[in-house]
């Protein structure tokens, strides 16, 4: 997980709040102070799935970073964490692809729920992509006639007809 914020206090707070998950090895955090540093970290650390980013930062702001991340990888999800919680900034962030938005001052219970939800979403995306890859590999080896036969109702009925049901009457 990459945390992008120009306030160094947030790094300390994140490390304190998630220290148990860090010790367990469930979470690994990387930190950057602006969008440009974040891009460098993302190019170097290819296993990052989640970015927590502020909006207002020097060099490259969070909204610009959000646009650049979607160019890097469609899997990486961004949660904006910002004091700019007005509806305009929230709408801009969501329209540029933010997965969620958390307002500062950060409620860490809310942040933890948001992080868990985002990680689950990313895992579902990864599982779906893996299933698609496996299906594509299978399609290379299975004849089209077999696939069309398997999609017919007769095939499903024949499978059900051969099904053995065992039961015990008490």
Feature map (PLM): residue ranges:
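Two-component/phosphorelay signaling modules centered on CheY-like receiver
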Residues: 8-30
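Acidic catalytic/metal-coordinating carboxylates
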Residues: 34-37, 61-64
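Active-site beta3 strand of CheY-like receiver
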Residues: 46-52
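Receiver (REC) domain active-site loop signature in two-component systems and cognate sites
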Residues: 57
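Short, conserved "switch-loop" micro-motifs in signal-transduction and mechanochemical regulators
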Residues: 84-85
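Regulatory cytosolic signal-relay segments
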Residues: 103-107, 111-165
